[in-house]
Amino acid sequence: VYNGLLSFEFDHLRCASVLARIGLGWMFAALLFVRFGWKVRAGITVLILVGYWLAMAFVPVPDAGGAGPFTLEGNLVGYIDRLFLPGRLHETVFDPEGLFSTVPAIATAMLGMFTGEWIKLRKEGLTDRNKVLCLVGAGAVLLIVGLLWSLVFPINKKLWTSSFVCVVGAYSVWMFALFFYIIDVLGWRKWTLFFTVIGMNSITIYLAQRFIRFS
């Protein structure tokens, strides 16, 4: 419906979407969560990011026409979309929420799961303040890895590159640590009602802007 299903013009229907990426990313992350322990899942996350980089950098695209592997016309994500994704691509030859670029989005979901597991962990001597410090350190590691990786695999949201996953993951972990410290550790909760309502209805608000003119 959001992308025009009820128009019944299926040649112009865009099948990919932000919500589909969120759903698929979390679905596969959840399947891994119920099947494997955190160490195996951490290894799978690394394999996803490294494998995606190697595929994007070194798998040739037959119809690239000499364009580079990270360009609009020459990237592997767009080639797979043109082969297998039905309907309309958002950018004609490429869709930023396409099939192959959803694979590293699973790693993004996994980072969120690891963060939640860490916060919920109960261990003798592990205080909430210690958890915050560890999250800050984890964010620093992610940022350094992402920036170094970007030298050979540019930070690119539309391609959801592995360096993008690391850098955005770092900022997200830091923001989570900040609000966890303020709200849960210090107990400053009175100002949070507005943001709680927004957070609990984020998908509704995202969809509403498509149908309601707020301006």
Indicate where each model-derived feature is located.
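Alpha-helical transmembrane segments and their immediate juxtamembrane cytosolic regions
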Residues: V1-S215
